[in-house]
Amino acid sequence: MISEEVFSSICGPPIAANTAISKDVGVYAHSLTPSWTVKSSFKKSSTPVHCLALSDSHVFAAQDQKAHVHVYSRLRGNQESLVPFQERIKCLALAGDVLVLGTVEGRLILWETCTGRQVTTPPCHVQAVSCIAVSPHHILSASEDSNVNVWSLAHLLESGQDVGLEPDRTLSNHRAAITDLVLGPSSNPETNLCVSASKDKTCILWNYLTGQVLRTLLFPTSPLCIALDPCARALFVSSEDGNLYLVDFFGDKPLLGSRSAELASIVVQVNSPLGVADEEAGSASCLSVSYDGTSVLTGHTKGKILKWNLVDNSHPTELANLNASVTNMIMAPLLRGKASSQTVTVVKPNQAQRQYTLTAQLEGNLSSNSRFDQMLNSKGFSPETIAEAIASLSAPSSGGSDDMDLKRQNDELREIIKEQQALQKATMERYAEAK
């Protein structure tokens, strides 16, 4: 049975003198289904909000008020290395094998974990980078200066382009610091979606490739953390007053698409919450949606992890109490993507390196070519492809039983026609005799 796994992190001192919870553990790996259990843990980490990233082989955790990133091996279950940087890290995200870090000085640092190559941008924001979101082709960095910068990942990683890097565009409709940023799964220029939350009590839906504002949502209090439904059909928002909101994009009154009745410039007021967390839980600092989109997990400042069941809309249930502020919750993918290599040990960044060396473990048999590779490298159609085509055209039809059934039906239809013709002939003869 496939098990959903969620990673959580904590930051700050213990809330209560609870001896049942280890004080050294900073990152937890929980099993969500079929039952909630702690599968593994990683020690000596204090990870603030937006400072946890996850790959198939490693866990990356930036440390609070420090310029360090702790790298943990998921395969070995221990801390692999401590990676220092020149500036304090405010947030991070993982784009494939590239770890993207935002600093308090407003810069972006890109670290290729398989090569050690490091790319640093100029100060792209006036204030600290508060959160980062990545897609297969783009990086979005949000800041306390209320702006969101859209970067091309390929352009940032282009060799010899460490100086003079600038974002492709800037999204600047917010009037206060941005608290969270999420991307939809689509990379199509017409259907890509980005949602930013801000202390100005709004969430803005963007087409981040064009910079178009698709919709502005206004809440009673400031949204602290947001998450999209797995299919980007709805937005989950947790605000500073403990309320959890569900905004349906394609409901009775669609907010997006051609069926939307209102102009994109019209602000939508969101007043009715899906539920309210108990006061002793505190406000939510992180939010995660299950793989099937039927439940929501929230991590709170008082150490509790709550599960909201969307099927029956019941009161949230407490899954765990980590005895410290829960700052990050990341759902691990159910199925690993097919990759030809795996990072067993990360290569620490080195700005002075002159050689580009890739360090990875190859997986599978790389010597055997696929059918596509064989067709691509052959001149015209390969002999095997031509032979298969000739065989498929010359082979006798496999539907012999179907042909016999059709022949039988045709014979029955001919008999019926003959009977009708004989009946018509007899009727006409009687009609002629009657005249």
Outline where the language-model segments fall:
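A short helix->beta-strand "capping" segment at the edge of beta-propeller domains
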Residues: V27-K43, R76, G164-E166, V268-L274
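WD40/WD-repeat beta-propeller blade N-cap
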Residues: F42-V49, V83-I89, P122-V129, L171-I178, ...
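Conserved strand-to-loop turn within each blade of WD40 beta-propeller repeats
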Residues: C11, Q63-Q65, G102-E105, A142-N147, ...
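A structural motif specific to WD40 beta-propellers
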Residues: T37-S40, N78-S81, R117-T120, S159, ...
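Terminal intrinsically disordered, low-complexity extensions flanking WD-repeat/beta-propeller proteins
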Residues: D252-S285, G303, V311-K435
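An edge-strand/N-cap motif at the start of beta-rich repeat modules
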Residues: M1-L32, V59-F60, L99
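WD40-repeat beta-propellers
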Residues: Y28-S31, V69-S73, L108-E112, V148-S152, ...
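Loop/turn segments within WD40 beta-propeller blades
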Residues: I2, C51-H58, L92-V98, G102, ...
